[in-house]
């Protein structure tokens, strides 16, 4: 699944490709992807001009002035721009024809991606309803708030970080990296973390997601950015996907286990389980 660094990289690519372009026609082949009114989606988008492309957590925000098209890539979603003819592909599901003759295509092998066309004034309420946490930046991701939320919860720390309420944008790859960097076992109850561990989790979340953005995201399966290029963050992953390899910190073999139903990579020496 594209996580915050991948979605931010897609955002930057889209802004380069389609900023200022007018949508002249929309073709939708998988109606279930649209979570707001279908007729409004089909009739309102033509004539809209793409004023900016933003992001909140793992959501892309295509700013159309008074309206915002909120796009979530889910597991396999990606955007491609074709300057002329669009080739046949059974995984191409949404087509945005632009005034300059190009077509922005949404591709999704799993068909899990979603679109919500909402008034810009409703955007805050949209994310509040989903209990989306702050962006992982020092200005918005406050240590004291993070600490209070953790200490009041019995949830294991990995599922808690994944649920998007503590901080927006973490997924399975970057959670494993953050937990390893902070020397925290993923099954530890949030309330049992000490202040030093919580500070490390906070600081490493900010650092690692920023590094992921700098490296253009991780291409570990099918991820490509909007320009069709791979990311390079996979070359900097310390624990995710490294089963059997020596821990970069202590040399112990990395192991893979299940936590909260998710495949999880840890160093059993650096990330000791609490008795």
UniProtKB/Swiss-Prot annotation:
Signal peptide: none annotated. InterPro entries: DNA_glyclase/AP_lyase_DNA-bd, DNA_glyclase_Znf_dom_DNA_BS, Formamido-pyr_DNA_Glyclase, FPG_cat, MutM-like_N-ter, Ribosomal_uS13-like_H2TH, Znf_DNA_glyclase/AP_lyase, Znf_FPG/IleRS. One of its GO terms (molecular function) is class I DNA-(apurinic or apyrimidinic site) endonuclease activity. It holds the Pfam family Fapy_DNA_glyco. The active site is at 2 (schiff-base intermediate with dna), 3 (proton donor), 58 (proton donor), 262 (proton donor). SMART domains: Fapy_DNA_glyco (SM00898), H2TH (SM01232). Keywords: DNA damage, DNA repair, DNA-binding, Glycosidase, Hydrolase, Lyase, Metal-binding, Multifunctional enzyme, Zinc, Zinc-finger. This is Formamidopyrimidine-DNA glycosylase. It comes from Streptococcus pyogenes serotype M28 (strain MGAS6180). The lineage of its organism: Bacteria, Bacillati, Bacillota, Bacilli, Lactobacillales. The gene is mutM.
């Amino acid at each position: 699944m594209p996580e915050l660094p991948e979605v931010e990289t897609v955002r930057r690519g889209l802004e380069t490709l389609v900023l200022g372009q007018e949508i002249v026609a929309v073709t939708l082949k998988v109606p279930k992807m649209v979570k707001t009114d279908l007729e409004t989606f089909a009739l309102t988008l033509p004539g809209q001009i793409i004023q900016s492309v933003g992001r909140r957590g793992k959501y892309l925000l295509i700013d159309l002035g008074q309206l915002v098209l909120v796009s979530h890539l889910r597991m396999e979603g990606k955007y491609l721009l074709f300057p002329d003819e669009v080739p046949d592909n059974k995984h191409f599901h949404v087509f945005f024809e632009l005034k300059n003759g190009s077509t922005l295509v949404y591709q999704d092998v799993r068909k899990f991606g979603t679109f919500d066309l909402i008034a810009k004034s409703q955007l805050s309420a949209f994310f509040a309803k989903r209990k989306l946490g702050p962006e992982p930046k020092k200005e918005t991701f406050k240590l004291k708030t993070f600490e209070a939320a953790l200490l009041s919860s019995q949830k294991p720390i990995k599922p808690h970080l994944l649920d998007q309420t503590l901080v927006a944008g973490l997924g399975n790859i970057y959670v494993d990296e953050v937990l390893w960097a902070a020397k925290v076992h993923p099954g530890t109850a949030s309330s049992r973390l000490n202040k030093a561990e919580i500070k490390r989790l906070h600081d490493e979340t900010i650092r690692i997601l920023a590094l992921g953005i700098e490296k253009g995201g991780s291409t570990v399966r099918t991820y490509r950015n909007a320009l069709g290029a791979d990311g390079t963050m996979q070359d900097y992953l310390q624990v995710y996907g490294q089963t059997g390899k020596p821990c970069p910190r202590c040399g112990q073999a990395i192991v893979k286990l299940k936590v909260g139903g998710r495949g999880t990579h840890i160093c059993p020496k650096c990330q000791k389980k609490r008795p």
